[in-house]
Curated annotation (Swiss-Prot):
Binds 1 zinc ion per subunit. CDD domains: Histidinol_dh (cd06572). It comes from Natronomonas pharaonis (strain ATCC 35678 / DSM 2160 / CIP 103997 / JCM 8858 / NBRC 14720 / NCIMB 2260 / Gabara). InterPro entries: Ald_DH/histidinol_DH, Histidinol_DH_CS, Histidinol_DH_monofunct, Hstdl_DH. This is Histidinol dehydrogenase. It catalyses: L-histidinol + 2 NAD(+) + H2O = L-histidine + 2 NADH + 3 H(+). GO terms for molecular function: histidinol dehydrogenase activity; NAD binding; zinc ion binding. Keywords: Amino-acid biosynthesis, Histidine biosynthesis, Metal-binding, NAD, Oxidoreductase, Zinc. Substrate binds at S229, Q251, H254, H321, D354, E408, H413.
């Protein structure tokens, strides 16, 4: 990787870094066909797609009972790791549960109450690897929120990943289906003979999954449309370049289209990070994906003229993952508002948030962190406002309400208040 100056980036280079999207447009037409077929044919379509896309002949779509058996048969070390991660995730998300409240305001009793959704679907990607962590991240916040029925959909296989099934059991999923891709999103959104329809679908996936979420949005709620993984590192000369590179390579491992960027106000540190990335990318099982991610136009090692310039870059970038490794990291954090999840200091690798620190790894990408946060308990509850007024309280607002209503030409609104004083 070459080091470029932030100030010298061409408009084209800046666009490649900042104009990140989920890359779903070319998938939407085929996804619409899949969704339409699932809505028409139900389980028949799901089995057909399992054979076409996954080369699997599936009988029973629901594999909920297999989850507990997978947990019982799991290797002790992996079981312990899943349970530890689950406990940390649960503890963090329990802190997010909102409390109902009512208060008096000059005779007006106003409040807000929160109620969980009834039915939620969590997509857990599969394909080249099993992702039990995604099951934990999607299911646990829903369970903590009090959702009555949480279903997991994961791609079918001749032998389903035991870790994924076990994670569903540990997290508290009520149903597990061996259905993947856009067809899984369609099944969760609209239901089939075997798959119960839900109110909301959450979880990461490839561009076909993301395109399907975009298509069903409006009929059901979704969390957000997430693209390939992103990491932005802001560091100074106190950072260890080898550790910065290790985090960048780790995120590049996710996807050849991942975006990994480092911005340092120290040129020597930037050069060392670039060199370390190239060295660490080699001789790995996923070297090809890592090297593709490091070499794509959305990845870069940059040198800023000052830490203020680096901070401005970070705020505009609005990364999914933001790592800050600097002498004054807390002060720098105070100056950056837009990021999905922040990792402070040299002992906070992004991987710990991916798995077990307790924060959620389902995060906004493509700059969405400017307006949205990561998956949380908030995604699984709805709020209702409540008001109760006595006669004196309504009387004090009578003129205000009737004047505004008549100014808007809504006489019946005004009369609905006046009649209470006839």
């Amino acid at each position: 990787m070459n080091v470029s100056a932030v100030a010298d980036l061409s408009p084209e280079a800046r666009a490649a870094l900042f104009e990140r999207d989920a890359g779903i447009e070319d998938a939407r037409e085929s996804v619409r066909d899949i969704i339409g077929r699932v809505r028409e044919e139900g389980d028949v379509a799901l089995r057909s797609y399992a054979k076409e896309f996954d080369d699997v002949d599936i009988g029973t779509l629901a594999v909920t009972d297999e989850a507990e058996r997978a947990y019982d048969d799991l290797d002790d070390d992996l079981r312990d790791a899943i349970e530890t991660a689950a406990e940390n995730i649960r503890t963090f998300h329990e802190r997010q549960v909102p409390d109902d409240w009512r208060e008096q305001f000059d005779g007006r009793e106003l409040g807000r109450r929160y109620r969980p959704l009834e039915r939620v679907g969590v997509y857990a990607p599969g394909g080249t690897a099993a992702y039990p962590s995604s099951v934990l991240m999607g299911v646990i916040p829903a369970v903590v929120a009090g959702v009555d029925h949480v279903a997991v959909a994961t791609p079918p296989a001749e032998e389903l990943p035991a870790a994924t099934l076990a994670a569903a059991h540990v997290a508290g999923a009520d149903a597990v289906y061996q259905v993947g891709g856009a067809q899984a999103i369609a099944a969760l959104a609209y239901g089939t003979e075997s798959v119960s329809a839900v109110q909301k679908v959450v979880g990461p996936g490839n561009r076909w999954v993301t395109a399907a979420k975009a298509e069903v949005r409006g009929d059901v709620e979704i969390d957000f449309l997430a693209g390939p993984s992103e990491l932005l590192v802001v560091c100074d000369d106190t950072a260890d370049p080898e550790l910065i590179a290790a985090d960048m390579v780790a995120q590049a491992e996710h996807d050849p289209n991942a975006s990994v960027v480092c911005v340092s106000d120290d040129e020597a540190t930037a050069e060392a990070v670039a060199d370390a990335c190239e060295r660490q990318a080699t001789a790995r099982e996923r070297t090809e994906a890592i090297e593709s991610a490091l070499e794509n136009d959305a990845s870069a090692v940059l040198c800023a003229r000052s830490m203020s310039e680096a901070v401005l870059f970070a705020e505009e970038y609005a990364a999914e993952h933001l790592s800050i490794v600097a002498a004054d990291e807390e002060a720098l954090l105070d100056r950056i508002d837009s990021a999905g999840s922040v990792f402070l200091g040299g002992f906070s690798p992004v991987a710990v948030g991916d798995y077990a620190s307790g924060t959620n790894h389902v995060l906004p990408t493509g700059g969405l962190a400017k307006v949205a946060g990561g998956l949380s308990v908030d995604h699984f509850v709805r709020s209702t406002t409540v008001q109760k007024l006595d006669e004196d309280a309504l009387s004090s607002l009578r003129e205000t309400v009737t004047t505004l209503a008549r100014a808007e030409g809504l006489e019946a609104h005004a009369e609905s208040v006046d009649k209470r004083f006839d």
